[in-house]
A protein has these predicted regions:
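NAD(P)+-binding Rossmann beta1-loop-alpha1 motif at the extreme N-terminus of oxidoreductases
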Residues: 2-130, 136-137, 141, 257, ...
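Hydrophobic packing residues within well-ordered alpha-helices of enzyme cores
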Residues: 100, 128, 161-165, 187-188
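Short, conserved loop/helix-junction motifs that constitute active-site signature segments
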Residues: 109-110, 165-171, 189-192
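Conserved beta-strand segments of alpha/beta enzyme cores
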Residues: 114, 134, 174, 195-197
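Rossmann-like NAD(P)-binding element
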Residues: 120-123, 130-175
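Rossmann-fold dinucleotide-binding core
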Residues: 177-258, 262
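Interdomain hinge/lid region at the active-site interface
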Residues: 275-365
Length: 365
């Protein structure tokens, strides 16, 4: 018997437990709700960590380059700020926000100095401040100072939060919304900001979560289990994945927006992205001869014709990506086996294989 069971006030007193008055059907219903909440937390933390790893690796690849004649000033500003490291903000730090912070620290190359938290009661986050994470209550300050801001507040708090930070979010900042009840279009109106990544989660009745949801009490413990990593993959076929492939489209376009800031030629940006996603993986082989991305994978033919070889990609409105089909949507539909390779990259990333980029000594780390 676990020690925490003996400490429970209802130990060996089933009539006093919360579920005692519930019928069998009601107990099944509450168990399903708990399972979905756990699955949402695990998926949300895993996908956020994968996104930060990819963005960090891409930034480091570009910042390590030294031959962009139009990007010296932008590069100087980025390197001057936090030595070029990706700055992460978490707005709202309840149970989910705290699990997200721990996941980012353990599953990415981010250090505590890279993460800031704004919450109404920062004094309750001593476990985070002891790690060196800045915790305060100033939503406007947080929004104005980070590269990626994770929204982890309650839906009921979103309007008040939006009114506080509206107009303070830099164009280059990506708002990663984990407020699942609010669509991206509405969030864009609230924030007057278009760089929004919002994963849309769905959990079907016939899925493996019921067998896995008690695997670990925290996302970090759960994501040590390979089966859990497998089912959180966003690159599974429709009906099995907990998040649609549209999320990865938003991720890819948001990563490419960073190359716009440095005025990196579009061909070179795609080349660096291919290096990260299709490069050597510590000798582990994925699918043979995967189809690589090209500039045409991300923009239409008329846009390609307007770009010179030295031109960067245009700035992508991420909220529009979530609402309509893009050239990347078509590219994925034409090359379905590509998802197998991306699923491999995702699994290796979660297993902490150096499949994306070794960032030691890069970007100030």
């Amino acid at each position: 018997m676990a020690e925490e069971d003996f400490l429970s006030l209802t130990y060996r007193l089933p009539s006093l437990s919360f579920e005692a008055p519930l019928s069998g059907e009601e107990r099944t219903f509450t168990q399903n709700i708990r399972m979905r909440a756990w699955a949402l937390t695990v998926c949300g933390c895993a996908h956020a960590a994968f996104y930060c790893r990819l963005l960090t690796a891409f930034r480091c690849r570009l910042l390590d380059e030294a031959h962009f004649p139009n990007s010296w000033l932008a590069k100087y500003k980025i390197l001057k700020s936090n030595r070029g490291a990706l700055k992460i903000g978490v707005l709202g730090c309840g149970n989910f926000g705290k699990q997200l912070v721990f996941s980012l620290l353990q599953l990415t190359d981010l250090t505590a100095a890279c993460i800031s938290v704004s919450t109404r009661r920062p004094e309750t986050l001593s476990d985070l401040t002891d790690l060196g994470i800045q915790c305060f209550y100033d939503n406007r300050r947080l929004a104005a100072s980070v590269d990626v801001m994770f929204l982890c507040c309650l839906p009921s708090q979103l309007f008040a939060v939006s009114s506080q930070i509206r107009g303070s979010i830099p164009k280059a900042c990506v708002v990663y919304s984990l407020v699942t009840a609010v669509p991206a279009a509405r969030l864009k109106n609230f924030l007057a900001h278009g760089s929004i990544v919002r994963p849309h989660y769905s959990f079907y009745e016939q899925n493996p979560w019921s067998k896995l949801w008690e695997t670990g009490k925290s996302p970090l413990k759960a994501l040590e289990v390979q089966e859990v990593i497998e089912v959180t993959s966003p690159f599974k076929e429709a009906g099995l994945s907990c998040v649609g492939l549209k999320w990865f489209e938003e991720v890819m376009y948001s990563v490419l927006n960073f190359s716009y800031l440095l005025k990196v030629p579009h061909g070179l940006s795609v080349g660096r992205l291919n290096d990260l996603l299709f490069g050597p993986s510590d000798g582990v082989e994925a699918i043979d001869s995967p189809v690589l991305f090209s500039s045409e994978s991300f923009v239409n033919a008329s846009c390609i014709q307007s770009l010179s070889l030295s031109s960067p990609f245009p700035w992508f409105d991420l909220s529009s990506v979530s609402l309509r089909n893009t050239p990347l949507t078509k590219f994925f539909s034409l090359h379905p086996r590509l998802q197998c390779h991306l699923s491999f990259v995702y699994r290796m990333s979660m297993l902490k294989k150096k499949v994306l980029h070794d960032t030691d000594g890069c970007c100030g780390h």
